[in-house]
């Protein structure tokens, strides 16, 4: 079957999106787990997996070209990477919760423990890689699944924004912007999934995603300024123990993924009445 160019480019964009995110996660995890100097051996697992997953996905992309589902080697390699990523994410979630929350199920332990939802980034990326190999990009279901994964990411981002900023009691009013932004994204994307044939709504959601990306960049700059001006003997200490420098960029990241799904739904044929 000949796949239209716009769908081939969408599948390729998701492949490169996933590979870039795995590479980025390696840096983010190294910084996060350096806080306790990788006290537990299993903290090295997501770091090592991220380093390996990025080139493996690129190799899969080179083997499969614009159709990772169509080439046997690319499909097998991608399925293995995707399944492993899901396992790493779920096990990381359980380990993060086990650090305090499973001992005493309190809101304080949920807020001040390791970020419980952070490992689910692996699960989301793994599911995205699996999607590219199990569903043809030309099918409307592909765009809906991509949008659903973006929605799930924003739900997790909402929880992370609440928990992270609750640690300092929302000291600055601007910290509420992240919570409101994530909540708006959840509302709009959930509506888009149920009213996916409404082209005007889908285009409005694209505008909302542009705002979400701006929120992410603004948050990154605010975290950067806070770390540069914050206490700490060295610049490394300020970034290590200060505001998580890369966390706000999750808004921009998810906005890109959601936009890919939204554009796929806009380009899909209108359902027959």
What are these regions (language model features)?
Residues 2-17, 141-145, 267-268:
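N-terminal membrane topogenic signal
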Residues 27-35, 62-65, 94-105, 159-168, ...:
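Juxtamembrane "helix-exit" motif on the non-cytosolic side of transmembrane helices
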Residues 48-61, 115-133, 180-192, 245-265:
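Hydrophobic cores of alpha-helical transmembrane segments in multi-pass inner/ER membrane proteins
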Residues 104-108, 229-245:
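Short, membrane-exposed interhelical loops at transmembrane-helix boundaries
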